[in-house]
Amino acid sequence: ARVTVPQNTHDSWRRASLLSHGIRPFFLGAALWAMAGMALWIAALTGHARPAVGYGLLAWHAHEFLFGYVGAVLSGFLLTAATNWTGRASLTGAPLLALFGLWLAGRIALYFYASVGPYALGIDVALLLVVALWFAREIVLARDWLNLRVVALILALASSNIAFHHEVLRYAAPGIAARLALALIVALIMVI
């Protein structure tokens, strides 16, 4: 029997690049950030680096793995899964690069918070908001109403990111936002 491979499969192999699927830049970024974040954390703890994070190293470390790392993994997954769930094309090329750049800008801005100031917080929070809005648009256009619950969880995670920043800047009791974020991450895993 002869196997027929759809033409678009050949095309995707031919143009297999970092920006052809959302999972590629974000999962690579998450993996590299996990290693770099740990290296920066260890360097700071041993006195070999002095990050200008603007708040305590423990808070920065917790934030970067709850929102930086998870934000990249969640974004990469949703950009890929949305195509299967909605039947619509996902972001590729320059729009995908811009979204990945937003994630990377958040990591850099928070590491140099003392230089960037409160703008760093807006840059950081923007990724989850943009991903939630993009995903909501895809769901509405595909009339895939069941997955609106994922949008609600992403928006709740973005809200916990805002609350985290609010706490570490000493406007609220510390720790609640981090626990909320962890609970929301578990909820996302269960729903997805």
Residue ranges and their predicted role:
Residues 1-192:
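Hydrophobic alpha-helical transmembrane segments of multi-pass integral membrane proteins
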